[in-house]
A protein has these predicted regions:
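Non-catalytic, solvent-exposed interaction/assembly segments
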Residues: 1-131
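Gly/Thr-rich phosphate-binding beta-strand-loop-beta motif of the actin/hexokinase/Hsp70
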Residues: 134-159
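Generic preference for flexible, low-structure residues
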Residues: 38-40, 77, 91-93, 144, ...
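Short acidic, glycine/serine/threonine-rich loops at helix termini
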Residues: 88-92, 152-155, 163
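Conserved nucleotide-binding/hydrolysis micro-motifs of P-loop NTPases
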Residues: 29-31, 83-84, 147-148, 156-158, ...
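Long, charge-dense
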Residues: 100, 106-121, 157-190
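Generic structural "secondary-structure junction" signal
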Residues: 127-134, 160, 175
């Protein structure tokens, strides 16, 4: 799950990167018929070829797309000289050709086709920022006879929060309640 630390790391590592970086957003949802047989790899290859991305970067990205099972709906790649990041997202981004907004429109160094958005140049984080902004974090509290559990849901993923509750000894409760400022009125005076 993408947590606050991961978001901070992405912002510092990728956002401040100098030089040309490939920012590639690929719809890899296996439930879609248009992605059968890893067709998304061909669309990504065409996008990188259209942007004239260096061959070594293209090969690294294609190796992941063709040889690894990406358990995600959208795969986000950031690739540069000394940078290679893959972020699997469990949500779908609007990566369709009919969505021609100001930030998804084809410009110099940007290529958009159904299911693939590629950008060659400075890191293009706007679709990722959109996903982080569009989807809210939710908390789920599960209570049974023995314990309480808290789960965090964000971007289609669920993760248990292990340190959500402070464990107190019941003897500490007694001491805390006896030391309360209003105890003299409850216990019959001094």
């Amino acid at each position: 799950m993408i947590g606050k630390e991961e978001i901070r790391r992405i912002r510092e590592l990728i956002g401040a990167k100098e030089g040309p970086v490939l920012s590639l957003y690929v719809d890899v949802n296996p439930a879609k018929p248009e992605n059968a047989g890893r067709a998304y790899a061909l669309r990504a290859k065409d996008a990188m070829k259209a942007l004239e991305v260096p061959g070594d970067l293209s090969e690294r990205v294609l190796e992941v797309l063709q040889n690894q099972v990406l358990e995600a709906r959208t795969a986000v790649f950031f690739a540069g000289e000394d940078l290679f990041e893959v972020l699997p997202l469990q949500v779908e981004l609007p990566l369709v050709n009919s969505v021609k907004t100001a930030f998804l429109d084809e410009k110099a160094g940007r290529y958009l086709v159904d299911g693939v958005l590629a950008h060659w140049g400075e890191p293009f984080l706007l679709p990722l920022v959109y996903a982080l902004d569009e989807y809210e974090r939710y908390g789920i509290v599960y209570v049974d006879r023995e314990r309480w559990r808290v789960f965090e849901v964000f971007l289609g993923e669920i993760e248990e929060v292990h340190d959500a509750f402070l464990a107190l000894d019941t003897e500490a409760w007694r001491r805390l309640s006896l030391d309360a400022p209003g105890r003299r009125f409850n216990l019959g005076g001094i």
